[in-house]
Design a protein with these regions (language model features):
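Rossmann-fold NAD(P)-binding glycine/threonine-rich loop
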Residues: 92-114
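ADP-ribose/adenylate-binding Rossmann-like module
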Residues: 80-98
Length: 130
């Protein structure tokens, strides 16, 4: 099982560094390889340019895609995960297009986990508090 982490923006780096330090297999995908190397190159050399076709070729059943990319990438990456028998995680809110994938994911025994970011977390806590 490999974790395919996409995106090394400011909000992604602390969690990515922690994950790499656990020793689990992580491949880092980023639009700018140099930026990813600056962020985590001291911890891993498994850094690749973000290319959907390359991710799809590398993806194996049971792998996990973590998307820390802008929201317009989440549904295409989740669909890719489903076709390859992989799981998907993002920090963003659930869009109607993502929700539409739920039945297919459940039928395949796969997890599509969303809303694990700071903003959704604060919203959920505040809603519970109110």
């Amino acid at each position: 099982m490999t974790i395919h982490w996409s995106g090394t923006g400011l909000s992604a780096i602390p969690g990515l560094r922690e994950l790499i330090q656990t020793g689990k297999p992580v491949t880092v995908w980023n639009r700018t390889v140099e930026k990813a190397q600056d962020a985590v190159g001291d911890l891993t050399q498994d850094i690749k340019r973000f290319e959907p076709a390359m991710i799809e070729a590398a993806l194996q059943p049971g792998d996990v895609i973590v998307s820390m990319l802008p929201g317009d990438w989440h549904v295409p990456l989740a669909k890719m995960a489903l076709t390859k028998g992989a799981h998907f995680v993002s920090s963003s809110y659930i869009s109607p297009e993502m929700r539409a994938l739920d039945t297919q994911a459940k039928a395949a025994g796969l997890a599509l986990v969303n809303e694990v970011g700071l903003d959704p977390g604060i919203d959920h806590l505040m809603a519970h508090y109110l």
